Amino acid sequence: MPNYNIAKTGKQTQAVKLLKDNKTVCLFGGSRSGKTFIALFAVVLRAINYIGTRHLVIRFRFSHAKQSICYDSMPDVLKVLKADTRVKLNKSDWFYEFPNGSTIWIGGLDDKERTEKILGNEFASIFLNEASQVSYDSHEMLTTRLNPPVGIKPLYIIDYNPPGKTHWGYSIFELRKFPDGRPVPEGDYARLKMNPHDNRENLSNDYIEGTLANLSAAKRKRFLDGDYGDDIGTLWRREWIRYQRQPDDLQRVVVGVDPTGSAGGDECGIVVSASDGVEYYVLDDYSLHGTPSEWAQAV
């Protein structure tokens, strides 16, 4: 059996323990802090140790997944594990094939046809990379595909540079509440903050003081300090929102649509709201990344 005890930072060692002990783990923090590397390390080890299993690494955009995972982080992980000559990347269907029959699939949620094909399968591990770009609906959909063979612990990993406090990740891992108000189960949904200072030994001498320290205050907070943003400029504050049952005497129900106008394809906001004449209620949120025809179908 090869020796897979690679050199890790202190925070990466903590991350490995969390990944062993929990089903769902969020690794969050500043830029270049070693989050993605250690998450991929865990997924690759599981592919090696659990013969013939299937695993998924996915981002919002498939092109970004190919660039950041296949051409950047994954080669480094396979090299330190001395598996780079034994694990093959299939560039037709974009999956890594291991000698023991295990596979790691690479996906992007923006590629609808490919995503549907991939998500027709079930996985022993799922790594949602840069989850700050991903909707809660997509996250929930991914969790339904986490179903390993009997006897293998499922593992769902999320990582991101912390987004604003309105993001579902803040609600789940910091407030310990799902977006619909249900409490998060005790004993799972672990989180670990990993910042550039924790990974200093693997960074260039000038990266922290010369690059990150000179960012604007908001970007320093996110990419250097690894803190969630305050969503300055938003219409609503999280503390204004209360979760409760829908009343029976609603007087008016409205479907609001806010199409995206950006070239980058931001989410189209689609919300069902109502009023009983005194208070206002959000009944459902169908916001999505998609084409105008997909917006229309959702409405």
Residue map of PLM features:
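Walker A/P-loop NTP-binding motif
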Residues: 36-50
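Conserved RecA-like ASCE P-loop NTPase motor core of nucleic-acid helicases/translocases
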Residues: 53-65
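ASCE P-loop NTPase helicase motor core
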Residues: 133-202, 207-210
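Nucleic-acid-processing active sites and adjacent nucleic-acid-binding tracks
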Residues: 264, 271-299
